[in-house]
Amino acid sequence: MTQTLIPLNFLAVAIGAALGACARWLAGLWLNSSAWPWGTLLVNLAGGYLIGLALAVLLAHPEWPQWIRLAAVTGFLGGLTTFSTFSAETVGMLERGAYATALGYAALSLVGSLALTALGLASAHALR
């Protein structure tokens, strides 16, 4: 699929990213604690599942306009998930000497996100 630089595509990414970033911020406010960043973990795992689901649905509908994929995947899911926050939280745990917690968080985030991306793809295929 070729990318077209049109104002609608910019707007789709911007609106999607703003909504995704706000959802991530709210999840952090509601769920993060000093002991464990549950909000970040949740949005990264949910994002893994949702991107798998979205990609499968979008691949099944190549006739859909480009802005839908840009708003949903590049915008919303790009704004929702965060590798930089995950990295900062993991390094913070390491700096506090919480090595086992940091390792568990990193492993759960990585393996969980990969597994949920695969589950999202499988879910979309099962619904066809």
UniProtKB/Swiss-Prot annotation:
Location in or out of the cell: Cell inner membrane
Signal peptide (UniProt feature, chain positions): none
Record-stated family: Belongs to the fluoride channel Fluc/FEX (TC 1.A.43) family.
Keyword annotations: Cell inner membrane, Cell membrane, Ion channel, Ion transport, Membrane, Metal-binding, Sodium, Transmembrane, Transmembrane helix, Transport
Protein role: Fluoride-specific ion channel. Important for reducing fluoride concentration in the cell, thus reducing its toxicity.
Disulfide bonds listed in the record: none
Keyword field contains Metal-binding: yes
Official protein name in the record: Fluoride-specific ion channel FluC
InterPro entries: FluC
Gene Ontology process terms (BP): cellular detoxification of fluoride
Residues reported in the UniProt entry to bind Na(+): 78, 81
Transmembrane segments annotated in the record for this chain: 10-30, 40-60, 71-91, 102-122
Family annotation (Pfam families): CRCB
Membrane topology note: Multi-pass membrane protein
Recorded name of the encoding gene: fluC
NCBIfam families tied to this protein: crcB (TIGR00494), PRK14196.1 (NF010792)
GO CC annotation terms, alphabetical: plasma membrane
